[in-house]
Regions:
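Long, hydrophobic, amphipathic alpha-helical segments used as structural scaffolds
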Residues: 19, 23-26, 30, 34, ...
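Amphipathic alpha-helical binding modules
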Residues: 69-99
Length: 99
């Protein structure tokens, strides 16, 4: 079995809710922009939401690291959670470009 599978599932279940909530808010705010005229505003909005997503996911990861602090290889779990955060951030960027 995959090491830390349950911990990653725990993270993903909560992270998905954060991701989709923020993405929906971003998509709604982006709808009001004309991308040709307001691309700089779009980029600023995207950056704001990306930073918020990153912060919230990092806080979630830290909470889980604290919860599972007695595990061996906690540094490996930390790396896996950071990898997961980067996946969510890249997904947000890709979905944003499609708007």
């Amino acid at each position: 079995m995959n090491e830390f599978a349950q911990e990653i599932v725990d993270f993903d279940n909560k992270a998905k809710k954060i991701f989709f909530s923020l993405y929906e808010k971003f998509a709604e705010s982006a709808k009001q922009l004309d991308r040709k005229k307001d691309d700089n505003v779009f980029q600023q909005q995207q950056g704001k939401y990306l930073n918020t997503l990153k912060t919230q996911l990092e806080n979630l990861a830290q909470d889980l690291l604290n919860k599972y602090s007695s595990l061996k290889n906690i540094n490996l779990l930390n790396k896996k959670l950071r990898d997961e955060i980067n996946i969510y951030l890249n997904e947000f960027r890709q979905k944003s470009r499609a708007l």
